[in-house]
Each structure stands twice: as structure tokens, then as C-alpha cells.
């Protein structure tokens, strides 16, 4: 009997045939992947959680033991219990481990932590990552054998504790949500003599971060130091550091010695605008930071940082000169960043490359600065007006194509030696796209435009 869905000359596949066809295509895809060498399959599996990688053993006999020799193990489900992890380690066969990641919140796992770390060390692990929740972290101490390991190159620690650690071969250290003291940090640094990169993420308690004895440390990143004793700015002594990235939440840091710095990325986040910290204090502190960047050639400034610099410019506070050759501005386009940007550009005579990134960066509403300037007696209709006569949008939500064009022209007018500009913005600014060739021709520079679709 003919299929009811058929017509003369055309036969529409039945649902049964469609399912069979779909299964066949999946099988062909699996077979195609299965033909790859083990080393490639294991490299692919190293990018997914180990629990998921183990499920590939059900695909076929070909896959049964592939996961056992992957270069990395990742136990990223904090609910995983000890029997599962123990069984996984028993079946693991790789002699060399690149990365071991453990995320757990189960208090019952605490007695097993030392043996799991010891297992990773026995496989000469390069990168050890521990993310332990409070109730687990409070009962955990680094075992003695950890201190004499010679293979560990990178350590990521997410713990609510302060402790000392010694890892003589460690090159990268990432500490998150740790309560530190100057003494404990000094002990950690003493135990890591060849450390090259240090990241402090949401750590608190430090008054002075002294890196003067870390002769190989080249990269320092501090993200939201959440607590500073007595609201004093943390001092940074880093004479050997080449790259500095700061994003502070309570107070900007005080740069005591960064004499070797070549690259810097600076911003302050929302808490820096709390009522307990005045804008005039912030402007003084931020300008002191900029004065320490006299040798920096690659500089990135965030939108909140630029807003405070705008206040300083409107008040007539002198800015330092810069040797910057590559400048990136991570900001939305609105009136509260204009004066600060103009002054930074004018004080950067050697600038060759300028990058504008406008992609959804979080900014404190500029109205705060407007209210602050109003209290100081400024004419708000004039103080935020560009010297070129442009009146800017007050809200970062009201950016039109003409604002983008005016913004780019303003930056071009305030530079003298610029060779290249890179602009990243949302793709609906059609008029600006049309203006790029003219701007490039008029100012004799190369403009690279990259667009993206805004998130819905």
C-alpha cells in the first residue's frame, strides 16, 4: 500500500525513515571521530569535565579506555563524592598529567584531599587547581609533600583561608577569596622563588604587597581587593614587574615602585564610588597612579577610571605626560568620559595605535558625577560640552551613530602621530560604517572596524 504522504513523482520520507536516517548520520559522525588517533581524542576530552569524558566509554569498544589516558582531570561538580573520584583515579593510566582540577563542597571529602593531591603530584602535574568551599577549606592544610614537588608550574587556589606554601618550581599562582596578611603573603612569595605571574582575585587584608624580592615576577593582576584595613590604599612594590592589571573595588592601589612596567590595564569598579570615598580623593589617587606609568608603552583604561579623570580635567588638575604608543579605551560613549579622554590623548604625543572597545562594559551611572560637579558650582550645560562644540548623550543607553562619528573624530583630532585605530562596536551603527572610508582618508590613518550583535 502506498504511503499516504506520497505524491506522484515525490516521496516524503516517513517518520520511521527519518529517525533511521538521523541515527545513521550520527553513527557516521561517531565513526569519523573514532578514526582519529588516541592522542587527539584525549586532547579533546581534556577540555570537558572528567565525569562527562568517562561517558564516552559507552560509545563503543574503541572508546572504552580512551579517557583513562587524558592529560587532564577535572572534577568540577562540587557534589562529587569520594568513591567516584577514587574509582576514577584507580582507572587513570596517564603517567604525565598536565592539569588536575578539584571543586568540592562536601565535608566528607576532606580526609581524601591529601591522597588526591598526592596522586596528582605522582603524575608530575603541571597545573594544580583547588576550589574548596568554606567548610572544606577551613579544615584543609597543604600537605608536607606539596612543598618539595618539583613538577608544579601553576597553582590556582580558591580558598577562604590564609596559609603559607612552598613550591619551588611554581611559575604561576592564582589566589581567590583568600584572607591574607602582609606576613603570609611574604612567606608565600619566599616559597616560590621563580614565580613569574601572580593573580589576586577578591583577596583581602593586604596593606603592602612587596614583590621586590620576586626577581622573575613579570605579571601582576589584582581584581577587586575586597577589604583593605582601615580604608588605606594597598601599596604595591613591584620593581621587576612588566605587566600590571588592576581593577579595584574599595580603593585604588598606591604604586610605590613599578619602574620596569611596560604594560598596564587600570579600572575601578562600582564600589569605588561609594559615599565614603569622595571623587576628589579618587582623582588625586588615580593621577598619582598615572604618574608612576611614565615608562608604560601599552595602556588600557576602563570607563570608570576615565570618568574620574574627567572630573580632574574639569577642575584643571594637571596631568602627567605619557610615553604610551598603544592605548585601549574600554568604555561606552557618553559625556562623562569625554574630558578625561581628551586630556589623556593630548598628553600622549607618541601614540601610534588607538583601540576603542565599547562592548557592554559596566559603568557607574554618570549622574553621580553630574551631581558632584553641580555641588561644586559647575555649569552642567557647559562643563560636559566638548571644546569642539559637541553636546554628548548623558546616558550610555542613548548612543546614536552621530555620537559614534563625533567620538571617533574627537579622538583623531587629539592625536598627532596616530597610524592605526581599531573600533569595536555594535553592528547597528550604520552611518558610522559608511563614514569609515572618509575618516580614514581625511586623517590619513588606517581604521579597522569590528562589529558585533548586541545581546538580547
Curated annotation (Swiss-Prot):
Residues 30-78 form the F-box domain. Pfam families: F-box (PF00646), LRR_At1g61320_AtMIF1 (PF23622). CDD domains: F-box_AtFBL13-like. The keyword Chloroplast does not apply. PANTHER family: OJ000223_09.16 PROTEIN (PTHR32153). Keywords: Leucine-rich repeat, Repeat. This is Putative F-box/LRR-repeat protein At3g18150. The lineage of its organism: Eukaryota, Viridiplantae, Streptophyta, Embryophyta, Tracheophyta. Coiled coil: none annotated. It comes from Arabidopsis thaliana. LRR repeats lie at residues 177-202, 203-213, 228-253, 278-303, 333-358, 396-422. PROSITE patterns: FBOX.
